[in-house]
A protein has these predicted regions:
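Phosphate/ribose-recognition catalytic cores of enzymes acting on nucleotide-derived substrates
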Residues: 2-101
């Protein structure tokens, strides 16, 4: 995912699902975005999340540690895809940022 925050593009890993590892009763679908290399508060901030590509299906992990390990792999894949699409379509992302902020 590409995340527009304060006029700057950041790479993100987006999960669309029901968190089956922790919520076995399959609650409603949630959209959660992990913004890579971001520290700070998002309270009061406007952000836009652009879905770029699909990495994998949602699965139930045996433990939180297994999930965290896989999130690391997925985050690196998301970072690589972010770098690739922004290198190819730099002008498109510049225009999108200008249109929204």
């Amino acid at each position: 995912a590409s995340v527009l925050l304060d006029g700057d593009w950041r790479s993100g890993a987006l999960n669309i699902g029901c968190n089956p590892t922790f919520l076995a009763d399959r609650r409603p679908t949630r959209f959660e975005t992990y913004i890579l290399d971001f520290e700070g508060s998002l309270y009061g901030k406007d952000i836009l999340v652009f879905i770029e590509s699909h990495i994998r299906q949602e699965v139930t992990f045996h433990s939180a540690a297994d999930l965290v390990r896989r999130m690391g792999i997925d985050s690196e894949e998301a970072r690589s895809r972010f770098i690739e699409v922004h290198a190819v379509d730099r002008d498109l992302y510049r225009r999108l940022a200008a249109a929204f902020f």
